Amino acid sequence: MERICPYCMNILSEGTSCPACGKDPEAYRPASHHFPPGTRLHDRYILGRVLGEGGFGITYLGLDTELERRVAVKEYFPTAFVKRETSLTLNVTCYTDAGQVCYEKGRSQFLKEARTMAKLEDIPEIVRVLDFFQANNTAYIVMEFLEGETLKDRTARLGRIPA
């Protein structure tokens, strides 16, 4: 299997730094609940670095091996209900039986939103959903990857956006 840079998803040649982005792929250290770079999902997507993480999900930079393009892969991972130790398993597990009910309801809602977003492909202001699926006892949404500034970074730089 080819080595892929977790920062930019380009194929790595021999050497310590990526010829495309200049970063050292060995320097990337994911948290214990994040997938390690190179993890494959759905026999199609290879995951790289974490792009962002919130209370209900983790978004990874990915590579769609069929379309040979970078994508963003959002994983349903509500930290209030689930955990994963990637050294042991790729599956998420709920902390409690009571949390399992809330988790399953949230996962269903996550997939429902993915279906809705996939139908909105003609709206240029909304990122396109390319695929969605369930695996590892959770759900995933695969979206087009768009380069640019995050809303968080923009508001830090320019202040609040007027309504």
Regions found by a protein language model. Give the residues of each.
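A short, low-complexity linker immediately N-terminal to eukaryotic Hanks-type protein kinase catalytic domains
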Residues: 28-47
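Protein kinase glycine-rich loop
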Residues: 47-54, 59
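Flexible N-lobe loop architecture of eukaryotic-like protein kinase catalytic domains
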Residues: 52, 112, 121-125
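Conserved N-lobe loop of protein kinases adjacent to the ATP-binding glycine-rich P-loop
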Residues: 63-71, 77-82
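AlphaC helix of the eukaryotic protein kinase fold
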Residues: 83-120
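Activation-segment/catalytic-loop signature of the eukaryotic protein kinase fold
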Residues: 131-132
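Conserved short submotifs of the Hanks-type protein kinase catalytic core
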Residues: 136-150, 154
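Activation segment of protein kinase catalytic domains, centered on the conserved DFG
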Residues: 156-163
